[in-house]
């Protein structure tokens, strides 16, 4: 797919602490069976791993739409993201400061905020929210899991279109775009070892913004060890402040006038 990159994004500001690990590439096996467990909220369910309680977000399916609701995570819990989890129109997910979410390698995990859905991820300088690989430190590699995707209803020059990377989700407002659309808050968030290539030229990036509106708050983001672009924008009117990237394998940032 031939695209025209029109903007090299703003200078990086290394405000969040970067993770240190090996940064060699690695293959990704196909999806495995979902874990057994009891759903707690329709989105999260718990399971014992040895003496630890682990809370799974999603069931490992490539298309797991969370039942409609407002989901609030707990920073004291151990979370694993499994499969492609969709926060649909009318639903929200709130992630408190200090929460760590580990992406499952086997199911190529990704969190997708669809049009009308919202994420409220408010970290702090001392307690950032971290999305990272579930692999043990020293074994983590770029592309261990998918990444974070936000889809909105703001303007682009192609109307409604499917987001890059393979998920079912569409972005853009068609003939009635909403440039003030609000997909929530990303503040003091770190994403590590993401960037799974679903197909050639259809990669899931560290963080992808599809027609995200100006009502969305985005600041103090860091993507490290991404296998594809650290950040990618497709149209939209969102303003992003203080973004940084380290140890990348593809482009730092891409923005397309779409």
PLM feature spans:
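Bacterial Sec-dependent N-terminal signal peptides
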Residues: 3, 8, 13-49
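Coil residues (strongly favoring Ser/Thr
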Residues: 52-53, 60-62, 180, 220
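Extracellular beta-strand-rich solenoid/capping regions of secreted or surface-exposed proteins
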Residues: 66-68, 82-94, 105-123, 137-156, ...
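All-beta strand scaffolds that present successive hydrophobic residues in beta-strands
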Residues: 73, 93-95, 119-123, 186-189, ...
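Extracellular beta-strand-rich, repetitive "passenger/adhesive" scaffolds
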Residues: 73-80, 95-100, 117-131
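Feature marks extracellular polysaccharide-active and adherence modules
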Residues: 96, 102-104, 114, 122, ...
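Conserved small/polar residues in nucleotide/adenosyl-binding loops
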Residues: 246-253
């Amino acid at each position: 797919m031939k695209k025209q990159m029109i903007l090299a994004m703003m200078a990086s500001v290394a405000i969040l602490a970067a993770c240190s690990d090996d940064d060699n590439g690695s293959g990704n096996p196909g999806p495995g069976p979902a874990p057994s467990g009891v759903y707690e909220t329709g989105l999260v369910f718990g399971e014992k791993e040895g003496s630890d309680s682990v809370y799974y977000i999603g069931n490992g399916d490539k298309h797991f739409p969370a039942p409609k609701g407002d989901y609030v995570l707990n920073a004291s819990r151990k979370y694993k993201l499994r499969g492609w989890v969709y926060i649909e129109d009318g639903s929200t997910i709130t992630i408190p400061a200090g929460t760590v979410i580990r992406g499952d390698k086997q199911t190529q995990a990704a969190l997708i905020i669809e049009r009308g859905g919202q994420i409220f991820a408010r970290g702090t300088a001392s307690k950032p929210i971290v999305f990272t690989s579930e692999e043990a430190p020293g074994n983590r590699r770029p592309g261990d899991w998918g990444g974070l995707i936000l889809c909105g209803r703001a303007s682009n020059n192609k109307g409604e279109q499917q987001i890059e990377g393979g998920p079912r989700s569409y972005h853009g407002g068609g003939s009635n775009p909403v440039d003030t659309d609000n997909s929530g808050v990303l503040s003091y968030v770190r994403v590590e070892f993401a960037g799974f290539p679903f197909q050639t030229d259809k990669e899931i990036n560290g963080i992808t913004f599809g027609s995200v509106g100006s009502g969305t708050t985005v600041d103090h983001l860091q993507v490290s060890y991404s296998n594809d672009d650290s950040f990618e924008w497709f149209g939209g009117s969102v303003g992003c402040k203080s973004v940084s990237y380290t140890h990348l394998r593809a482009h730092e940032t891409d923005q397309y006038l779409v």
